[in-house]
């Protein structure tokens, strides 16, 4: 009875993992999510501010080696750097603390500061929100820091897969922002 049921459940779980790992099903599921907010083309003529969501940084490795360590979502940082140059008058904000319970003293912001310095940008031009642990806190803690005014155009940079969630929480806190998705992972079908 029970042993047979457990074996059947284990077999089914293993089969599901294999299907997700070795077939294009994962990309097929990810693709519609990544397409919810299209890439900005053309870019707006004017932007008042740019918010970079955390998630591309590896604070533990940055701290250990003293140089910026990035993960596969590094495109968000390079996009932030490029947009900061394109819109030099825009206010710049990075939002991301740590979700790592073992390394609460390490912030993603330090990685961003080092990266921007290496890119020739002054990290002091950026406001840093370093307490958030999730997307909701990114929006809730960044809005009072950035103090956006009515009618201003703000871009929010994040991975294409997470930008729908980010847009939802930014709207929930009463901040109307424009999505700037990057770090696509699903192939174009």
Q: PLM features: residue spans?
A:
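Membrane-interface helix-boundary motifs at transmembrane edges
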Residues: 2-7
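A structural signal for short, hydrophobic/glycine-enriched beta-strand patches
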Residues: 14, 19-189
């Amino acid at each position: 009875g029970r042993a047979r049921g457990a074996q059947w459940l284990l077999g089914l779980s293993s089969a599901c993992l294999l299907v997700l790992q070795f077939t294009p099903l994962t990309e097929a599921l990810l693709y519609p999510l990544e397409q919810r907010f299209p890439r900005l083309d053309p870019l707006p003529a004017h932007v008042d501010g740019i918010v970079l969501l955390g998630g591309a940084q590896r604070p533990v490795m940055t701290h250990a080696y003293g140089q910026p360590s990035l993960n596969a979502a590094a495109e968000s940082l390079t996009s932030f750097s490029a947009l900061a140059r394109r819109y030099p008058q825009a206010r710049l904000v990075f939002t991301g603390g740590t979700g790592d319970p073992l390394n609460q003293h390490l912030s993603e912001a330090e990685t961003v500061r080092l990266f921007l310095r290496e890119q020739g940008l002054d990290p002091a031009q950026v406001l840093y929100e370093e307490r958030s642990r999730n997307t909701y806190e990114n929006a809730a803690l960044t809005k009072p820091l950035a103090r956006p005014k009515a009618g201003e155009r703000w871009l929010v940079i994040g991975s294409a897969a997470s930008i729908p969630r980010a847009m939802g929480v930014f709207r929930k806190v009463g901040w109307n922002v424009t999505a700037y998705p990057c770090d696509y992972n699903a192939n174009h079908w």
